Amino acid sequence: METRPSFAPNLYFCDARLVGPLHAWPPLFERVAAWGFDHVLIGGLWAASRRGYPRHVADPDRPAESFATSLDATSALARLSDSAREHGLRIAVEVVVDRVAREHPLHDAHRAWYVVDERDDALIDPRTAALAHDVAHANVGSAAALDALADWWRARLGALADAGAAAFLVDAPQRMPAHWWAALLRALRQARADLPVIAGVPGREREALAQLACAGFDAAFSSLRWWDLRAPWFVEEHRLLRRVGAPIAFPDAFDGPRLAHDWRQAAPETIERAHRRALWTAAALGTGWLVPMGFERGVAVELMAREPRADAYRAALDSAPFDLSGAIAEANALRRATPALRGNGEIAQLTGADAPATVLLRGARTALEYDDEAALIAVNPDLAHPAAIAPCAALAGVPGGFTRFAPFADGRRPRMGALEPFALAAGACTLLRAQRARPVTTAPAEDRRGNRPGTRASVTAALAGERIAIERIEPVVDDGRFAVKRVIGERLAVRAAIFADGHARLAAAVQWRAADENGWHEARCAAEGNDAWRADIPLERLGRHLFRVIAWRDDWATLVDEIGKKHAAGQAVALELEEARRLAADVLTRAPEANPAALAVLREFAAALDAAPPDQRLALIGAPHVADAFAALRERAFATRDAPVFPVDVERRAARFASWYEMFPRSASDDVRRHGTFDDVVAHLPRIRDMGFDVLYFPPIHPIGTTARKGRNNSLQAAPDDVGSPYAIGSPAGGHTAVHPQLGSLDAFRRLVAAARAHDLEIALDFAVQCSPDHPWLTEHPGWFAWRPDGSLRYAENPPKRYQDIVNPDFYARDAMPALWIALRDVVLFWIDAGVRIFRVDNPHTKPLPFWAWMIADVRARHPDTVFLSEAFTRPSMMYRLAKLGFSQSYTYFTWRESKREFIDYLTELADGPAREYFRPNFFVNTPDINPRHLQQAPRTQFVIRAALAATLSGLWGMYSGFELCESDALPDSEEYRDAEKYELRARDWRRPGHIGDEIARLNRARRDNPALQTHLGIRFAHAPNDAVLVFSKATPAHDNVVVVAISLDPWHPQATDFTLDAALYRGWGIADGERLVAVDQTADHVETWHGRRHYVALDPHVRPFAIWRVAPAAGVARGARDDARDVPAQEVHER
């Protein structure tokens, strides 16, 4: 606790030798008073030593020669004090206690009080020789000398105070013992309680400051002058100085090199900027502050130097490039009006040392937490560049909760508000008033006044609250807002953290049901340790499922556990056995008759327990069948059900594992002179099947409009025989539910669907929500479209691009709600009726999200086996959101990923991040619109590499026809194919030399043979030092299928690398780390035995740029308990 108000002076320091005679002082006092100072601190008041050091006093009764007076020093001080008082000022005097000039009368009269330094090195060192010859130091090693000096200085300071000295500055007080100061100042204040004494200790180390903490000083000088305005030491020094006395800051040195000297090489405006910054920083951060004479005009002449340079000082004043008198007056006025700038309060630095600007908060009291108001100081340490202030960084956890700010206003009540981001000019310093925001109190007003009628209601609610905590349920998507995705036949592993107060045993279960069921199924959870619980639930039906987690206190298990522990410790358990008997009896009286078998077991147990002697009851209570009976009767104390019900979408395998082949059926004739038909496609089915594909995907097969039809290579003028883009859907022949007449009839399409199924292929159709200007809907439903003010249609645009052959319906046009939505849903249902269950949706990110959520849910409610592929090459957030809304799978950025690091990062995001629960990537190597630059002019081996990457990294991959022929001719500086099939018919020689159909077939065969390759999950990247080789492993959750894949990323040169298998693989098998493995090459029918975790692979792109091994423990390898952890995270593993 502070015993008196902080000493917070506004000091102006004067070197007496530079001011001049006594008659020169009144004009100085007048100016200083006008600037708002309340004290003038005088240094060099007394006659200096022969060598001229002003702090080495030669005669305490003689003033400095510069006063030009016959008065003694005390009388001169009295005259100065009287003159200062006339201007509202008080005089403070600097005194030096620990040393005197050797010619000082006190030294002559009392040699035992002092010691002189006669060491040779002190005399030889030119930096200290003059000082050593000039001075005598107090004999601090002598108690008698210290007592005598204390008496002398007590009388001396008293006499100076009588002469008008209102405060004293003690130079280097740390040179005298702290206890000596405490006794001296205590005695001095017995006579003059209001006489402040300042410790002149700037730049002193922590130990010196700590020693003076109890010495009794009223104030102490800080080291602000030398702070870089960044480092945290200033705040730490302030904390220590507050224990010594109120910190006094100064913008410039009152002895030693001046600020103007530091910046002497800078431009005049920079020097002024430095002075202004120093001024406001000192005024804001000191309890008191001191301005050395000449600072206001940027004078560089040193004060308190051995040789006074009065003429140079006056010349510098006369030629000063700036005058800060007005700013000084403003600072003094602000300090007088602002308690937070005058208190000996806490200063907190709110920004780090490397922040662009430094922000500090200071209060007036002991701690900011207890201050009513504070001041925010923001300063730019850079004199050349502005700095931005980010409140979010500066105010995080702000001490005292000060979050309302306003500029300091003269006499007006400021309007406080939140701190907005702002910029500080170069070298600027800004001060803001700070207040706390009113804390949030939610208790009713009558409760806050002490009458607490609301207490009963709140405590009643608390009593009904959930005693058991259920947290961190997984897997969930966005806290259950969207469904987790799984495929039919999987078991969903549900995990949760479940815990409660005390030591009672808990039990938990996962309840689940299909969305068309009313009752809940239940699976008991197993405890995995550390409050983790798990249950696996079967997913045996397609469609939406729901699950929830429940928990309860298992009183029977708790009692049995307690009895067992006490018995094992040799404690009596008779009372606990009686509790068990009563618990069983209570359950029998409450239990319903719905479970007669459990009731029978419990009745038999109760009877046996009554009849058994005490030594046999223990065995009866611990019987497992008794615990099972209690569980079956669902005696669940404090049962807690987690509020949310979490959805799960169960889809068929094609949603997670499929190999897609895209072709234009109109090119199926293999003759550019004849439009292909569905019947022509049938002839291609064996070729596509033999490459191992199972999904055959067509771009739109509907009638194509003729208005603004695009010509070859996307030209704006179409020739009469140009076929146009199939995405310009609709003509007089029909719209989205019609078949292009040249492809055949709807019956022909149905025949194709049946033929594809006979070849183990499934047809996927493109669902493109767009129309040509000739679409029947424009005449039948013009209100479904957007029209321009001139009556023209609003064509599809992606400014500045315009697609005159396409118009988009307006989902929120007045006439379109809900008719358009229903019509589009009916399009999907129409093609489902025609035998299609897979739809690739064109650009879904350009259509409203609520439509997709409704449409997919509505279709799946009728046909849960429907699969939707999202073709949304857009921002990740939108791609992920579409997946959450129900799209089964999505195109991805794989098409543009090329480097090893990119593959690792992207697969880690997809397989180990939140997206793993709902986003299934379909890795297309190319599309009719995307001819990737890494394939253009690339060798055959690059196509094999991209196919291997897509086929092994994801369970879903696809290619557009022509990829197997290594087609890559592109338009200049474009990813568009030259002579793109999107605008014309194409004929190909499917068996021409150089095709990669055989390699694709081997890849797809490896995918079918290895369940680990049928998903993107379970992947772990191995450490391989060669960045041109990607090595990874994939494992099923049960580790009953593990593959290791190595792929060269260099299509030109052979590459080789070591790689290290992850230890998690061995844990998954339940074998020792590095045990023998059998590795079966999946494309070369070669078997190897691997020893240890490190292995080697060499890949020649001209032979085979990839290797796929199925690995398993060798015969005879001992197996233990396997690590049944969740799917292996997709991260790169480094050998330790």
From Swiss-Prot:
An example Gene Ontology biological process: alpha-glucan biosynthetic process
Site residues, Transition state stabilizer: D929
Keyword annotations of the record: Carbohydrate metabolism, Glycosyltransferase, Transferase
Active-site positions on this chain: D842 (nucleophile), E871 (proton donor)
Annotated spans, Maltosyltransferase: 440-1136
GO MF, any single term: hexosyltransferase activity
CDD domains referenced in this protein's UniProt entry, alphabetically: AmyAc_GlgE_like
Organism domain of life: Bacteria
Region annotation (Unknown) ranges: 1-439
Gene3D superfamilies noted in UniProt: Glycosidases (3.20.20.80), Golgi alpha-mannosidase II (2.60.40.1180), Immunoglobulins (2.60.40.10), Phosphotransferase system, lactose/cellobiose-type IIA subunit (1.20.58.80)
EC code: 2.4.99.16
Pfam families membership: GLGE_C (PF21702), GlgE_dom_N_S (PF11896)
Catalytic activity: alpha-maltose 1-phosphate + [(1->4)-alpha-D-glucosyl](n) = [(1->4)-alpha-D-glucosyl](n+2) + phosphate
The keyword Glycosyltransferase appears for this protein: yes
Binding positions for alpha-maltose 1-phosphate per the UniProt entry: K710, Q770, D805, N843, K982, Y983
Subunit-structure text: Homodimer.
Described function: Maltosyltransferase that uses maltose 1-phosphate (M1P) as the sugar donor to elongate linear or branched alpha-(1->4)-glucans. Is involved in a branched alpha-glucan biosynthetic pathway from trehalose, together with TreS, Mak and GlgB.
Record family assignment: In the C-terminal section; belongs to the glycosyl hydrolase 13 family. GlgE subfamily.
PANTHER family per the UniProt record, alphabetical: ALPHA-1,4-GLUCAN:MALTOSE-1-PHOSPHATE MALTOSYLTRANSFERASE (PTHR47786), GLYCOSYL HYDROLASE FAMILY 13 CATALYTIC DOMAIN-CONTAINING PROTEIN (PTHR47786:SF2)
Name used for this protein in its record: Alpha-1,4-glucan:maltose-1-phosphate maltosyltransferase
Native species: Burkholderia pseudomallei (strain K96243)
